[in-house]
Each structure stands twice: as C-alpha cells, then as structure tokens.
Swiss-Prot record:
<dbReference type="GO" id="GO:0006508">
    <property type="term" value="P:proteolysis"/>
</dbReference>
<keyword id="KW-0238">DNA-binding</keyword>
<dbReference type="InterPro" id="IPR006197">
    <property type="entry name" value="Peptidase_S24_LexA"/>
</dbReference>
<dbReference type="InterPro" id="IPR015927">
    <property type="entry name" value="Peptidase_S24_S26A/B/C"/>
</dbReference>
<feature type="site" description="Cleavage; by autolysis">
    <location>
        <begin position="125"/>
        <end position="126"/>
    </location>
</feature>
<keyword id="KW-0068">Autocatalytic cleavage</keyword>
<keyword id="KW-0227">DNA damage</keyword>
<keyword id="KW-0234">DNA repair</keyword>
<dbReference type="InterPro" id="IPR036388">
    <property type="entry name" value="WH-like_DNA-bd_sf"/>
</dbReference>
<dbReference type="InterPro" id="IPR006200">
    <property type="entry name" value="LexA"/>
</dbReference>
<dbReference type="Pfam" id="PF01726">
    <property type="entry name" value="LexA_DNA_bind"/>
</dbReference>
<keyword id="KW-0235">DNA replication</keyword>
<keyword id="KW-0804">Transcription</keyword>
<keyword id="KW-0378">Hydrolase</keyword>
<feature type="active site" description="For autocatalytic cleavage activity">
    <location>
        <position position="198"/>
    </location>
</feature>
<comment type="similarity">
    <text>Belongs to the peptidase S24 family.</text>
</comment>
<feature type="region of interest" description="Disordered">
    <location>
        <begin position="78"/>
        <end position="113"/>
    </location>
</feature>
Amino acid sequence: MLTRKQQELLLFIHERMKESGVPPSFDEMKDALDLASKSGIHRLITALEERGFIRRLPNRARALEVIKLPEAYSPSLQPRRGFSPSVIEGSLGKPQPVQPPAPAKPANDENNSAVSVPVMGRIAAGVPISAIQNNTHDITVPADMLGSGEHYALEVKGDSMIDAGIFDGDTVIIRNSTTANPGDIVVALVDDEEATLKRFRRKGASIALEAANPAYETRIFGPDRVKVQGKLVGLIRRYH
C-alpha cells in the first residue's frame, strides 16, 4: 500500500508524462507536493521504485517510467501545478516548410487541425546568444497546442533547461507576450541584444532568469534590462 504522498507523486508523474511526454523536474515535484526540499522527493521516488510502481531509466537525466498505477487511481487526485508543455516527438529531419509562411495560420489540412508556425532562428538554453533572426522556415503543429494569440518557434541551443524537459536541438513553441508570471518559462531579451530561454522569477525589484540545470547560475538583472518576448507553450523533439 502506498502512503498518500507516494500516491500523489506517482499520479503527478503519470499525468505530467501523459500530458507532455516528459517527466516533471524534481523542483516541480517538490512544489506540487508542498515539500520543503528535494530530498523528500528522492525518498518518495526510491520507495515507489522499490514497490515496483516506477523505474529509473539508465544513462538519461531525469528519466522515469511509470510501470503501474494504484487500483483506486483517479485523475482528480492528481495535483496540478507548474508548466505542462505539449510535446510532439518525431523522426529527425528538417521540418518541411508549409505555405504561406504566416504566424498561426491554418496549414493545408481539410479539418484545419494543424497550423503553420514560423521558425525564427535559435534561442540559447545556456549562456545568452544573439538570437531571434528572420523566419527561416515554417513547421506544422496541432492547433490545440497553441490556443489564442500569435506564436512562433525557436530552435534550442544549449542544456541549461534540461531539468524542465527541454534539450539541445528541441524546437520550442512560443506565444507572443510581453509579460510573465513567476515560474513561467520565457524568451527573455537582455539589454536589447541577447535572447535566452529561462524560467522567469522576481527578486525584489530585480528580475531573475533561472536555469533548470544546477551547472548554471541564476542571473539577476535590473527590470529595465530584461524584456519578455514570449512564453513557452510547447515543444517538438526529433530522434535519429
């Protein structure tokens, strides 16, 4: 029999993977269960692994697999907090352009179930780089991934967001926005020169751009140095 916290964590992992295709980070698990530290999450995961509910996948960062669920499983028991991106996974290869190259227009699809989103260049998930360029090509994404507003896509370079399930080579889908809430993953323009993909935080009157990789430090800026360019709503991943 599982404890309440063990069951909450198991269902949180299961629902997140069902929604986004990637497991939540340890920070997201900690916040979802209202725990004070990540050590409690490590203990819960070990207990779930020992009881045969999950297993850790070797040689992969933050890789978990849910093997079984409690008999009394109900989606309503699952805590829902933090970022839950939509994920498309497919074969490696350059996405084929879809005409016309306009933001969030219906692609050539009889049911208009897909839309064309422009890929605007690369974004750093690491040390900021000079970023957003002109439209290089378009990709087709499911319409229900986007919701309202204007969208664009960026190719990720770097590994600073791996604990948020965002890897080097992924394509992120961004909703145009000039504002963000604490905890949102955003495209941030620093000093009108460099763009980076980071989690948005506030530190008093300052803005913190927080990585999701312990190898990278959180960077603090004055509010006049950072402009939010959009918020992450989904990602696309390709494999060899």
